[in-house]
């Protein structure tokens, strides 16, 4: 029996933010064929460095892994968005240092998943729904650098990518500035089901 395990953070472990509505894993189960299973190993608040421990607890029956992590790593580095600098070069150095540290942690997370020798799908970090337009624009620029790490890592290993920036693209997809609502969760679940079962048609293809 095919068995999808969701790894990572509150993109999947979003029950606390749905106002009583279904969480992502519940909605995913409703999207899958009857003979498929879905389990939640993701933990709200998890960072890339926590993924290896999640993978270690994955049941032997798992046949597919889906990873969405990085948002909390980004939150920990959010202070750089307001860091005073003397030049654009200084600003870019701050971003580069953050990217370098995140890349090491993210590649380790993916390596831990790949060690299970199962099909793996990874997700980008979505833009969120920050109410302040100026902050939102700065956050998107910084997240682009982190998402580049995710896409390059996926390309290096021939992995499929779910671009959550395109999936959760409306205000109602969010329960707050950073967490998916049940509406957004349904869209995430649909994307996961389509990729895992092969039922979906990619909206774009990337060759590397």
Short names for language-model regions:
Residues 53-208:
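Alpha-helical cap/lid subdomain in secreted, periplasmic
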Residues 1-46, 54-61:
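Serine-esterase "nucleophile elbow" of acetyl-processing enzymes
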